[in-house]
């Protein structure tokens, strides 16, 4: 099944991240890395940092639920 995001990705990215779950995981990791780099450059934590951290945490929770739900359905399909 081809998703709309497939057309936006360069071919090498499609090869590196063949499934939608690989792509979601890569996005999650990139968000984490970007947040880490930005926060490391700041001398002190501020309200903006807390808001950003909460948003990133929310995205992580959503991604975990998607992958968890898929795992449950995959197990159910595998049972005879």
From Swiss-Prot:
Keywords in alphabetical order: Host nucleus, Viral genome packaging, Viral release from host cell
UniProt-annotated location(s): Host nucleus
Source superkingdom: Viruses
Keyword Nucleus: no
GO biological process: viral DNA genome packaging
GO CC annotation, single: host cell nucleus
Quaternary organization: Associates with TRM1 and TRM3 to form the tripartite terminase complex.
Family: Belongs to the herpesviridae TRM2 protein family.
Function (record text): Component of the molecular motor that translocates viral genomic DNA in empty capsid during DNA packaging. Forms a tripartite terminase complex together with TRM1 and TRM3 in the host cytoplasm. Once the complex reaches the host nucleus, it interacts with the capsid portal vertex. This portal forms a ring in which genomic DNA is translocated into the capsid.
Protein name: Tripartite terminase subunit 2
Organism: Human herpesvirus 8 type P (isolate GK18) (HHV-8)
């Amino acid at each position: 099944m081809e998703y709309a995001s497939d057309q936006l990705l360069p071919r090498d990215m499609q090869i590196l991240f063949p499934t939608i779950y690989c792509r979601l995981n890569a996005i999650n990791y990139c968000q984490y890395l970007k947040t880490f780099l930005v926060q490391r450059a700041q001398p002190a934590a501020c309200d903006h940092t807390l808001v950003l951290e909460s948003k990133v945490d929310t995205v992580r929770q959503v991604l975990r639920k998607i992958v968890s739900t898929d795992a449950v359905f995959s197990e159910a399909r595998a049972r005879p």
